[in-house]
Amino acid sequence: MATSSTLPAVVPALGGDQSLNHYLADIRKFPILKPEEEYMLAKRFQEHQDPKAASRLVTSHLRLVAKIAMGYRGYGLPVSELISEGNIGLMQGVKKFDPERGFRLATYAIWWIKASIQEYILRSWSLVKMGTTAAQKKLFFNLRRLKSNMNAFEDGDLKPDEVDSIATNLGVSNEEVVNMNRRMAMGGDSSLNITMREDGEGQMQDWLVDQEPLQDQQIEEEEESLVRHKLLIEAMDKLNDREKHILTERRLSDNPKTLEELSQVYGVSRERVRQIEVRAFDKLQKAIMELAGDRKLLPAMA
């Protein structure tokens, strides 16, 4: 984890969980920027590398980092460390931000913040030592949510139908789901000493979350949703008509069709429809990532 010396001097010190409540109180003192203020500061930093402009951009978004970091508290790491890593991602986002592209800084920086936090969690869990694949990362950061959606809170093995559902949802193999679930149930590296569940009660972090609206949060979420929707529409054009139709009917419809129904439409087996669905989903994800990368919406990976 980076030390506080890598952060701008105006960022409050964050030494450990004991000071976390003080830190969250301190960052609420920084004013929220209006769109025109944010634009002018971003232009000043972009054109003149003005450190004061950069500091104001960073400090006005520290609450965003804290809120995102709170969402990762179920991985057994101190929230203070997650926030510190997120702050580093925020500063990278500020450095790369182009105000002329029409997005608010929060919409752009959220990619960098999440990437920085996730990479830190992965390093801490030593998944990289296993040769972390894109599928493993996807599973690691979505498995708890999907299990929660199907009320599968137990730490034991998943039921076969639960494995099938998660594998199909994420476009990975059943074996990868089973292996990742077992690894996460064991708590990763024993040195992490994980003591909290995602549905646990009485944790200090639970009452430290800022309940006030987060700097035009609704507007920012709408902007991000619009960006993702545009990327999805463009990425769908990379699929052929059959792939597009099957993927839409299986994953993007309010009333998804069954494999049997689609197998009758195309005169192929249910397994063939499933294969086309998985392949189309994989192509769609890659297309979205390529489009996002071309538009500089993603951090550059080392």
UniProtKB/Swiss-Prot annotation:
GO cellular component, one term: cytoplasm
Region (Sigma-70 factor domain-2): 57-126
UniProt-annotated stretches for the region Sigma-70 factor domain-4: 235-286
SUPFAM superfamilies recorded: Sigma2 domain of RNA polymerase sigma factors (SSF88946), Sigma3 and sigma4 domains of RNA polymerase sigma factors (SSF88659)
GO molecular function: DNA binding; sigma factor activity
Broad class of the protein's primary localization: cytoplasm
A Pfam family per the record: Sigma70_r2
Single GO biological process annotation from the record: response to heat
NCBIfam families, A to Z: PRK06596.1 (NF005143), rpoH_proteo (TIGR02392), sigma70-ECF (TIGR02937)
Function noted in UniProt: Sigma factors are initiation factors that promote the attachment of RNA polymerase to specific initiation sites and are then released. This sigma factor is involved in regulation of expression of heat shock genes.
Name of the molecule in the record: RNA polymerase sigma factor RpoH
Species whose genome carries this gene: Zymomonas mobilis subsp. mobilis (strain ATCC 31821 / ZM4 / CP4)
Gene field: rpoH
